[in-house]
């Protein structure tokens, strides 16, 4: 960094708010980045020659004067001055702030500067917004510099490296240390660094609760890697409600407290939509407090949904832990019809694989020669619904489609962190499935399961009360196609039958594109209400709820009981099928209408949307320039340059006396690790989902575990609460207990009611991880004899020390994972964090036998540079 100084001079009489703003920016530069800008008089400046910022009132300037007369000029000249003294990182941050000032609000900007001659027209409130952004982005430089720096990946595979799947390579690249220098095997524990944390306004409440409940305040490891979106319940129609105001206030408080760079507030985007379109990158590890976090697999991020406490700990530390999971491979071949998009394809996969079977607790890796025909929008829908398959997540192997999509982003900061891995040809998969895309047709998943899939032609003329096009699953290309279907129907004079119709795009940028294309008008003419961007009917807990007994056709991702509203019935399909069915309010084959749409027109509209994503702010304001923008030569897709993960390995470090207190000092679980739990059984069946355990309608009004428990299984098992209170404190369930959403409120509700243990044939991945995270004992037993004996009301004895469960005179062994045991001994992750601080994952991993601490921070870190090694001193990863 070169040495230098910057001087500031005020000329004439500027408004006080402008002077205060400029001086505030000067203080921010000094306080955050140590850059001193000295305020001098004109006479003093004549004696020296540093880079100078001369601010003047508009009426005090002469033609050709170098004085700065506008916000645009101030930020531009400040960047020039900083560039002169070698502060390139700060220049990049301020240029980004300037760009946000010029960008319209429906594109995520402030819309303060329309052109270079705007002057100091911004009022105090707008200038405060700019000041906050400058502070946030400069603070982000500090956060990035102090955060863990991942070793650079290798340009080629080295000898003696085990073959790995795509997910394994991403985890290995992010691991602090591996159990073996050759790589990782299924089931091995890793402490890993995360790239992004994402949350909704609703899950943020649970995240904060996990900290506040133990007397700690939430914190972030990087203020530029926390994506918080208001989408689940907030809506302009409910902004006046006290609980909604609390949620909005919670987001605003987080933005201010953490100096967040990536908080767009309420109803700008559904959590996943713009995050995947504009933030997630290939090779990243993303953690989110929402089960559809897996959507980012569309751009080859390993994106995994977890519970609120888990995600809060990752947000505070920049770390988390995983056991290396199995993967299954879905190999695409063939080419789909032009109108077959991602929703039809994932429904076809659900039809073939079924829920919670082959994909359960595994990662689904998508690839094959047919993948090149799938856009990133199609991949979004496919990955989004991998959670409905029961998978941990889904991820596409990055290819030319991925590379072009990421390269088309306008901001380099959101495409410069991409790392392109591909699975090894000899990688091991639990199963491989072939999907011929040419066989995919329009499907519908009938209530109440996403895998109850049949061709649309088998359900023709089913009467409907409502048609919904929306939710994150419904991408931009789906909305465009649905509008074209409606347009054809309107042109043919199709009448609109009585019924409810609603369309909710996934983000304001998509709304803006549809508006300029004239497609919002088409939806309006076809009778579709257009409320604000939100999850809407897909969640059924905000302003939009389906009525009791109503039969809906929806393009959302879930059709569980009570999902769209208490007592409602939902079937899911593509947006095109919903659009075709909305005229008669009966399920309709969309092909007659689709056949009237020129595929070339559809592609032209998608190309325009692509161009607007990468357009400069000025071009976005003038739809007339779109035709010019669209004349750009579309670059030919190119394959990315693939790399190999760096393998960090350090031999296990023996515990020393000055290391954090061992878990061995905490030998008792919340249920009594050395004691025996004696209770009675309450038996449930297979596939008990989190919507059933704690219905969404009760989450907002139940801030404590006890209040959540008062509504546990209220809709499906009204006697459950009284039975648990009467002493039936052990839940015995079947397959995939806790499937559905990531809501941590489900195990919290059980624990708050008084449930001591849940035993099941299997747990859904997120729910199964949430149990020990909140300190609730969970046991997997697959022996059918146990379930024959464990009926409601039967006495049961659980001996954690002996790892046995006894019922009806028979004893059944069980295995408890070491990490789960470590968490339960601490009564959950939040309590462990309170005791161990930001070293919580290092300490927890250190207590898992034979894991070597999942990566100690002592000794030396080996950083890969090209093909050579250089040794640098270790830095703290806390």
UniProtKB/Swiss-Prot annotation:
Its function, per the record, reads:
Aconitase; part of the gene cluster that mediates the de novo generation of L-homotyrosine from acetyl-CoA and 4-hydroxyphenyl-pyruvate. L-homotyrosine is a building block of echinocandin B, a fungal lipidated cyclic hexapeptide that acts as an antifungal agent. This is followed by isomerization of 2-(4-hydroxy-benzyl)-malate to 3-(4-hydroxybenzyl)-malate by htyD.
Which EC numbers does the record give? 4.2.1.-
Which residues are connected by disulfide bridges in this protein? none
State one molecular function term (GO).
lyase activity
Q: What is one GO biological process annotated to this record? A: proteinogenic amino acid biosynthetic process
At the top level of its lineage, which domain of life is listed?
Eukaryota
Q: Is the keyword Metal-binding assigned to this protein?
A: yes
Do you know which CDD domains this protein is assigned to? Answer: IPMI_Swivel
Q: Which Pfam families match?
A: Aconitase (PF00330), Aconitase_C (PF00694)
* Region of interest: Disordered: 626-671
What name has this protein been given in UniProt?
Aconitase htyD
Query: What practical purpose does this protein serve?
Result: Due to their effectiveness as antifungal agents, echinocandin derivatives can be used for the treatment of human invasive candidiasis.
Family, according to the entry, reads as follows:
Belongs to the aconitase/IPM isomerase family.
Q: Where along this sequence does the record place binding of [4Fe-4S] cluster?
A: 472, 535, 538
- What does the record give as its pathway? Antifungal biosynthesis
User: Could you say which residues bind substrate here?
Assistant: 173, 290-292, 558, 563, 742-743
State the organism named in the record: Aspergillus rugulosus
Key words, A-Z? Iron, Iron-sulfur, Lyase, Metal-binding
């Amino acid at each position: 960094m070169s040495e230098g100084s910057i001087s500031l001079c005020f000329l004439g009489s500027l408004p006080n708010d402008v002077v205060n703003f400029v001086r505030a920016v000067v203080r921010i530069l000094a306080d955050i980045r140590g850059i001193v800008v000295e305020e001098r008089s004109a006479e003093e400046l004549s004696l020296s020659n540093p880079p100078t910022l001369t601010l003047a009132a508009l009426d005090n300037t002469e033609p050709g004067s170098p004085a700065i007369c506008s916000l645009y000029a101030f930020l531009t000249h400040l960047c020039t001055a900083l560039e002169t003294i070698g502060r390139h990182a700060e220049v990049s941050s301020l240029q980004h702030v300037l760009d946000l000032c010029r960008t319209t609000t429906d594109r995520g900007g402030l819309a303060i500067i329309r052109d270079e001659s705007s002057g100091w027209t911004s009022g105090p409130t707008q200038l405060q917004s700019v000041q906050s952004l400058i502070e946030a982005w400069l603070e982000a430089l500090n956060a990035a510099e102090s955060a863990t720096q991942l070793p650079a990946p290798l340009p080629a595979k080295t000898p003696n490296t085990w073959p790995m799947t795509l997910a394994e390579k991403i985890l290995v690249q992010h691991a602090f240390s591996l159990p073996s220098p050759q790589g990782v095997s299924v089931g091995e524990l890793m402490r890993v660094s995360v790239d992004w944390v994402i949350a909704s306004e609703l899950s943020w409440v649970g995240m904060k609760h996990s900290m506040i409940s133990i007397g700690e305040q939430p914190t972030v490891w990087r203020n530029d890697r926390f994506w918080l979106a208001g989408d689940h319940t907030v809506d302009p129609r409910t902004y006046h409600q006290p609980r909604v105001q609390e949620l909005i206030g919670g987001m605003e408080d987080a933005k201010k407290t953490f100096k967040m760079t990536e908080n767009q507030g309420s109803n700008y985007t559904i959590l996943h939509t713009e995050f995947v379109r504009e933030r997630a990158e290939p090779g990243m590890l993303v953690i989110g407090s929402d089960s559809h976090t897996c959507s980012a697999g569309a751009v080859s991020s390993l994106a995994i949904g977890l519970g609120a406490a888990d995600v809060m700990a990752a947000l505070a530390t920049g770390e988390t832990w995983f056991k290396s999971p199995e993967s299954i491979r879905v190999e695409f071949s063939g080419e789909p019809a032009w109108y077959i998009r991602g929703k039809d394809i994932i429904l076809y996969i659900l039809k073939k694989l079924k829920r919670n079977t082959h994909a359960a607790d595994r990662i689904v890796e998508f690839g094959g020669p047919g993948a090149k025909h799938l856009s990133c929008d199609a991949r979004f829908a496919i990955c989004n619904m991998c959670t409905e398959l029961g998978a941990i997540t889904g991820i596409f192997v990055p290819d030319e489609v991925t590379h072009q999509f990421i390269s088309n982003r306008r901001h380099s900061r959101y495409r410069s962190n991409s790392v392109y891995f591909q699975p090894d040809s000899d990688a091991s998969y639990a199963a491989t499935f072939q999907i011929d895309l040419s066989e995919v047709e329009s499907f519908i998943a009938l209530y109440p399961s996403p895998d109850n899939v049949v061709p649309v032609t088998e359900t023709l003329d089913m009467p409907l009360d409502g048609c919904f096009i929306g939710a994150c699953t419904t991408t931009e290309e789906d909305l465009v196609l649905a509008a074209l279907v409606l347009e054809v129907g309107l042109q043919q004079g199709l009448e609109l039958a009585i019924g409810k119709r609603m369309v909710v795009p996934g983000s304001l940028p998509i709304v803006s594109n549809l508006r300029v294309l004239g497609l919002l008008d088409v939806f309006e003419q076809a009778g579709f209400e257009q409320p604000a961007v939100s999850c809407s009917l897909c969640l059924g807990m905000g302003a939009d709820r389906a009525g009791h007994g109503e039969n809906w056709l929806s393009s959302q991702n879930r059709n569980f009981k009570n999902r769209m509203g208490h007592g409602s019935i939902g079937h899911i399909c593509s947006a095109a099928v919903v659009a075709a069915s909305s005229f008669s309010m009966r399920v309709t084959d969309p092909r007659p209408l689709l056949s009237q749409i020129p595929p070339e027109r559809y592609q032209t509209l998608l190309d325009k949307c692509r161009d607007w994503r990468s357009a400069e702010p000025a071009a976005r304001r003038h739809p007339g320039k779109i035709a010019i923008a669209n004349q750009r030569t579309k670059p030919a897709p190119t394959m990315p340059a693939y790399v190999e993960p760096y393998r960090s390995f350090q031999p296990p470090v023996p515990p020393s006396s000055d290391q954090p207190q061992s878990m061995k000092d905490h030998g008792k679980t919340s249920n009594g690790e050395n004691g025996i739990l004696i209770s009675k059984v309450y038996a449930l069946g297979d596939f008990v989902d989190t919507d059933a355990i704690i219905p969404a309608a009760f989450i907002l009004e139940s801030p404590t575990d006890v209040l959540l428990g008062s509504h546990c299984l209220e809709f499906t098992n009204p006697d459950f609460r009284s039975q648990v209170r009467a002493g039936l404190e052990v839940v015995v369930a079947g397959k995939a207990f806790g499937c559905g959403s990531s809501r941590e409120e489900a195990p919290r509700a059980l624990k708050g009611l008084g449930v001591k243990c849940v035993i099941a044939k299997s747990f859904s991945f997120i729910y199964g991880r949430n149990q020990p995270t909140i300190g609730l004992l969970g046991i997997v037993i697959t022996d059918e004899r146990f379930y024959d004996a464990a009926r409601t009301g039967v006495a049961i004895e659980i001996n954690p020390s002996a790892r046995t469960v006894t019922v009806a005179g028979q004893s059944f062994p069980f295995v408890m994972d070491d990490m789960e045991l470590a968490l339960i001994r601490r009564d959950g992750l939040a309590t462990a964090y309170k005791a161990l601080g930001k070293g919580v994952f290092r300490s927890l991993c250190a207590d898992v036998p034979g894991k070597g601490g999942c990566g100690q921070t002592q000794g030396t870190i080996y950083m890969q540079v090209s093909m050579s090694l250089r040794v640098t001193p270790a830095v703290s990863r806390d």
